[in-house]
Amino acid sequence: MRLFIMAMLVIPSTALAGWSLYEIFLPNGLTNLEIAQLGLGLTLFAWLCMAFWTGIIGFFLQLFNIDPLSLRRIQAQPDSATPLGQKHAVVMPVYNEDTRRIMVGFEACIRELMDSDNSAQFDFYMLSDTRDMAKADAELRAFTRLKKRLGGYSSQVFYRRREKNLHRKVGNLKEFCERWGANYESMIVLDADSVMTGERMQDLARRIEQNPDTALVQTIPMPVRQNTFFGRFVQFAAHLYSPMLATGLSFWQTDSANYWGHNAIIRIAPFMQHCGLPTLEGRAPFGGEILSHDFVEAALLRRAGWQAYLLTDTTGSYEEVPSNIVDYAIRDRRWVQ
């Protein structure tokens, strides 16, 4: 029903925008180029209209303090009084990153949980695919120093570097799951520039343990630590509209939310069972490795009958974003074949 409502909002809006563009082209007749422009325009209008109505729905749900899933005033929360009963892994895949930055973020997450009542239920893994030998050596030295600083808790912190980084990040996580996944109920996946509070990590683990039909909970990672005008502007914009968009997305996605590749918790057993990705036949861009693997993995979990949710509470989950438009373009090229 919610998807139908969303479609009834998006389709007429897109049609109206497309008709307006058509009327601009019409007086002098339509050329082949203008027909192509009209087709591309309709595609972009649909995308924009979907974001617009998602934001509008989220705005009113937040305005009246209504939970986007239950549509009630009180949002369901996991029972925080019950201690965690399963083991969970916090994994950070890295590839040729700035060693100091990743170690600072990694240690911050560890220390967030060290003194908690559930500290024994979490293990931490830095999963390195670094090819630059100088950076790989720096990672190992920094990790050795980290273990010394952590004292007794260091027995729950691990570093692994693959000799061959087959299948990029997908292969990195796959190897972790095959080697150690059976020891854990779930894994919290962080990016190299991610940070998560101890309370948020415990909250995610509770949601997995207390909802046996749920395989994925995606948080909203909020941008932090920006000091350029561009970076601060992006950070401000995200803090302004992310709560509305997240609430709107949760309203119409319900238990079929997307996976963004990081700052999320995944139940390991169904992930291993259903989310093996093939190498597509043919030449790029339609063949080869699936680059936006996270979207596909969420769809595979949902197809197998597992639930996936977007957590609309934006506290406790953070990431860094590129500080200028050039770095943004470089990052976006990762998904271009």
Where are these regions (language model features)?
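N-terminal membrane-anchoring/stem segments of glycan-assembly enzymes
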Residues: 1-82
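Internal catalytic domains of large membrane-associated glycosyltransferases
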Residues: 53-56, 60-337
